[in-house]
Amino acid sequence: WIVQKNGSLIQNAGGNQDGEKKRYCFQDVEENRYEAPLLSDVPKCTYDFSDLKTDEQTGYKSYQDPETGAKAKLGIDVSEFQGEVIDWKQVKESGVEFVMVRLGYRAYGESGSLVLDAMYEQNVKNALEAGLQVGVYFFSQAVSPAEAVEEAEFVLEHLKHYNITGPVVFDTEEIKWDSARTDGNTRQDFTNYCKVFCDTIEHAGYDPMIY
C-alpha cells in the first residue's frame, strides 16, 4: 500500500478508472525504486506509524496500537558478523525481549554449499540461557523446490537440540554486488521456493516467517 522509509511516505501509485489494478511503490536500502501490483485479497496493514515512539535515552523504538492494544516487542538480529563476544546478560537487561539468530546460509556461488553460521551454536545457547526468546533465519539461494526442501531440512536438523519458540525465517535477497546462482530465478520461482521452505518448517511444528 504505502511504504514508510526513514520516516517519509512513498505515495501509492494508484490505478485508473478503467479497471487497471492499483500498484504500490517502495524503495530498497539503496533507494532503488520499485512498483508491484496491489493484491486486492491481501488485507492492508492497519498500523499507524505516527504512533511509533523513540526512547530518547536508548534510541529504541516502540509501538502500541491505540485501538487493539497490540504492542511491538523489542528484538535484535545476530550472526557471526557481530563477533564472538556478546554480553547476553546486558542484552537482556537492556530491554531486548527476543533475538533472531542466523542459523546458516547457502553460498551464492555455483556450488551452493549449505553452511552453518560460525556463531550459531554459541549465540543460541547463550541467548536461551539469558532468558531470551529465540528465533532463527536461513539465507536461501535455492534454485529449485528440492533445494528449498534441502535448506529447510538443514535448518530443522540444527534446531532439534534447542527450545526454539520464535519464528523460523526464510531469508531471500537480491545479490546486488556480485553474480549469484539465483539470478535466473523468476518472481514466481522465488514465491514457490519460499512456500516450499515454509511448508516444510510448518509441518515440523515451527512457525515459518519471511524476511
List the model feature ranges, each with a label.
Residues 6-104:
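Boundary/entry segment of secreted carbohydrate-active catalytic domains
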